[in-house]
Regions:
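Residues at secondary-structure transition points
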Residues: 18-22, 49, 153, 218, ...
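Ribokinase/PfkB-type carbohydrate-kinase core domain
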Residues: 1-4, 57-59, 65-68, 82-207, ...
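Active-site metal-binding loops of divalent metal-dependent hydrolases
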Residues: 7-9, 170, 226
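Conserved phosphate-binding/catalytic region of the ribokinase-like
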Residues: 178-264
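Substrate-binding N-lobe of the ribokinase-like
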Residues: 2, 12-78, 84-85
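Active-site catalytic pocket residues across diverse enzymes, especially alpha/beta-hydrolases
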Residues: 35, 135, 235
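Conserved sugar-transfer catalytic core signal across GT-A, GT-B, and GT-C glycosyltransferases
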Residues: 23, 27, 131, 216
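A short, flexible beta-alpha/helix-coil linker loop
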Residues: 10-13, 214-216
Length: 264
């Protein structure tokens, strides 16, 4: 089995601490510990010290790195701030996209997508439309993190391609996800609700999972990526939505206990 994720790899810059991160890096590092599948990352880092930090962080992980390119320029970086309760937040000038912003898929990258048993990406990434095009050319299971997107008219345009849809939500999001799940019966909609757990919809049926208990929240960075990794690893193993939600919740709870998106 092949699981491929793309495209964001970056460093998260905290006060006095630089941590490897980005949705794809967090996801790959986490899911590689939960499955025997072959895990690939497609993306790029810059030829700078941050790029070395990213690559060094996953050198001992069971991740295939042949589709990670080192390009001239800056590795993407995100200046990350934490509230006293451990919730992360950003400022207008936090993000530097670096080589991530201009990354383009190669022919080899496209071939990998077509041979994957699950591809996981983000709606906000620069290669999202290319991934959709690849999927329409030759179908593969596709998981997409829509994060806080609320433009459901736009989301609906892509649902013919999406197997698993993750979105951070609220009550109106739940209502729209339920409606769409009855229409797009090949897509499982997973709405994460923070401390209120998560709700999934499949063919109009709702499934709810409470958040796993956490004694103390250190940092919420990478929590969503960990949930998605746990969910997908479990779902690919047995196709059970409720079991997958529970695994996602447990995996996210572990990530809340340390600084950064994954341990290395």
């Amino acid at each position: 089995m092949i699981i491929t994720t793309l495209t964001c790899m970056c460093v998260d810059i905290f006060d006095n601490t630089i941590m490897p991160g980005g949705e794809s890096l967090n996801f790959a590092a986490t899911i590689s510990r939960l499955t025997d599948a072959k895990v690939y990352i497609i993306g790029a880092v810059g030829n700078d010290s941050y790029g070395k930090t990213v690559l060094d962080s996953i050198k001992d992980f069971s991740i295939d790195k042949t589709h990670i390119r080192t390009e001239n320029g800056d590795t993407a970086s995100n200046r990350t701030y934490l509230t006293p309760d451990g919730d992360r937040y950003y400022k207008d000038d936090s993000w530097n996209g670096g080589v991530f912003s201009s990354f383009a898929l190669s022919a080899s990258d496209r071939e990998l997508l077509h041979s994957s048993d699950m591809v996981h990406t983000t709606f906000s990434g620069p290669n999202f439309n290319d991934v959709i095009s690849c999927c329409r050319e030759k179908r593969f299971p596709l998981s997409v993190d829509f994060d806080i997107c609320r433009d459901f008219d736009t989301i609906e345009k892509y649902l013919d391609c999406i197997s698993l849809l993750f979105i951070s939500g609220d009550k109106p999001t739940l209502e729209k996800a339920k409606r769409l799940s009855a229409k797009y019966t090949d897509t499982v909609f997973i709405v994460t609700l923070g401390e209120n757990g998560s709700t999934a919809f499949s063919k109009g049926t709702a499934y709810h999972c409470a958040a796993a208990e956490v004694s103390e929240v250190t940092d919420t960075t990478g929590c969503g990526d960990s949930y998605q990794a746990g969910f997908i690893a479990s779902y690919l193993a047995d196709g059970n939505i409720e079991t997958a939600m529970s695994k996602g919740s447990q995996t996210a709870a572990q990530t809340l206990s340390f600084i950064g998106g994954f341990r290395y």
